């Protein structure tokens, strides 16, 4: 069984506005290309992601779309029980819909938010329950995913059976060109 942890920038870190922002289309296109390649090679069974607004929710949406054509499952993991409870009503509804559509969802801490320890335990869980990670993240432009990136890099020094794939800004620019070219062909 092959499992991938997907994370990356939050929507506000990328300056996205609304669900129809062209940046979101390009990011989802890039994620879809990565996942499709793994699926075609028989190297992916589960997408395991968080529920942060941004790359994590967009990757879950891509996984749900790919699930229609591939034997792919989606797990949404939360770092604590009441994750998202302070979000706007619309964003809480998005989270609930995502949890309803996932094959599995749970929280790594069964308690409400208490502090940074819950995020470290979440990272540890995600790392231990996946075989590789895909981060839409560029170390030259730090964001909240910096902590996931640094933790994975640290563990890669000890584990050679884990793989980290980065989709950085250069990759996103290339994905935008590819997407635009594919749209012209249609």
Swiss-Prot record:
**What InterPro entries does its record include?**
YspA
Origin, by domain of life?
A: Bacteria
- Family membership: Belongs to the UPF0398 family.
Show the HAMAP family listed in the entry: UPF0398
Q: What is this protein called?
A: UPF0398 protein Ldb1014
